[in-house]
Amino acid sequence: MPWRGILAVGGGAAIGAWLRWGLGIMLNPVFPTLPLGTLSANLIGGLLMGFAMEIITRHAVMSPEMQLLATTGFLGGLTTFSTFSAEIVTLLLRREYFWGTIAIASHVIGSLAMTILGILVVRALYAWAAA
């Protein structure tokens, strides 16, 4: 595996993980039943992934290392399926089924919606700039 790719993924992942950690510290105490730090990391990650998908599609000039840094590295470090899973299982073990369902829907539907929104925002900006 090329060293530049390894460094790109590792560097991006570190920055994304630090941001996720900071969001958790700031936001999880606000509403402990539905940890907002994890949710915001996943929603922001979805939005940024939409931006990245559309920009990468439009600009093939972005180097593979930059793509790895942004998507696999940074967004992979920012978003968190394992923490999401642990939080959902904790709610279910506490028999908080309503909140577990709300959390699942918020993360899954919210992240998909934010990814679509990211794509649409970039498309709108390109259309506006071309007009």
Model regions: which residues?
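Membrane-interface helix-loop junctions in multi-pass transporters/channels
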Residues: 1-131
